[in-house]
C-alpha cells in the first residue's frame, strides 16, 4: 500500500534495500505474479503492437491482485471492523489516496480480461522531451484500421475534476500508431467517435 499511495507509483527497489538490483528480485516478482498475489505492470518504451518487444523489466508497478485485500492491508492498524472501514471509504469519511484504490481496481479488471499490463512513462528530463505518463496500454481492435489491432492508451482518474495533459501529449505524439483512447472516471459515459476518445465510468473497466 505504501508504494501505491505515492504520486509516482513506480516500484522503488530502494525501499527493499538501498543497494537492490532488479536481477536479485526478478524471481520474487515473478513468484508474486504467478501466485496471483500481485499484478505486475511493466513500462513499454514504444506504444506499438507487440508491447513485450519494448518492455523495460527494470521499470514496473506492483499492484495488488485483490483490491479488497489492498484496502484491508491499508487499514490493518485501524481498530474498526472491516465493515466499518468499507462503509467509511464509500461515504468518503476517510482521508485516503483514492487514486491508489482506483488504479489498482482498473489493473485488476484489465488483468481479469486477459491483458498483460503495460504503462508508458517519459520523464521529460531530456532536452526537447515533454513529461507524460499513461497509466495503462492495451491492444484492442481498431475500427478505423479495418479492425486490426492498435494500442489504446488508458488514463485513470479518481476525482471528478481532472486534466488530461499526459494523454493529450501522448496522442499528439503517437497519433498514427494508436487507436481509441480511454479515460476511466467517476462520471457518465462520453463517447467522441470523431476525436477517437471515450470517457467511461469506472465500473466499465471490465469492458476493456
Each language-model region and where it sits:
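A cross-kingdom feature that marks ATP-driven nucleic-acid transaction machinery
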Residues: 27-208
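Conserved helicase/translocase motor-coupling segment
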Residues: 1-34
Amino acid at each position: 500500500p505504501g508504494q501505491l499511495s505515492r504520486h509516482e507509483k513506480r516500484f522503488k527497489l530502494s525501499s527493499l534495500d538501498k543497494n537492490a538490483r532488479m536481477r536479485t528480485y526478478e524471481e520474487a516478482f515473478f513468484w508474486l505474479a504467478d501466485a496471483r498475489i500481485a499484478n505486475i505492470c511493466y513500462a513499454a518504451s514504444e506504444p506499438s503492437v507487440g508491447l513485450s518487444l519494448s518492455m523495460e523489466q527494470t521499470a514496473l508497478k506492483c499492484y495488488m491482485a485483490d483490491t479488497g485485500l489492498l484496502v484491508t492491508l491499508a487499514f490493518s492498524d485501524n481498530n474498526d471492523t472491516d465493515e466499518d472501514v468499507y462503509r467509511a471509504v464509500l461515504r468518503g469519511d476517510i482521508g485516503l489516496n483514492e487514486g491508489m484504490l482506483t488504479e489498482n481496481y482498473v489493473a485488476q479488471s484489465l488483468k481479469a480480461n486477459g491483458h498483460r499490463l503495460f504503462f508508458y512513462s517519459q520523464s521529460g528530463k531530456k532536452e526537447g522531451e515533454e513529461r507524460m505518463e499513461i497509466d495503462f496500454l492495451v491492444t484492442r481492435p481498431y475500427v478505423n484500421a479495418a479492425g486490426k489491432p492498435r494500442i489504446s492508451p488508458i488514463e485513470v482518474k479518481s476525482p471528478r475534476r481532472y486534466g488530461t495533459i499526459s494523454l493529450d501529449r501522448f496522442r499528439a505524439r503517437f497519433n498514427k500508431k494508436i487507436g481509441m483512447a480511454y479515460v476511466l472516471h467517476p462520471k457518465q459515459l462520453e463517447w467522441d467517435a470523431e476525436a477517437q476518445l471515450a470517457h467511461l465510468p469506472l465500473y466499465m473497466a471490465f469492458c476493456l
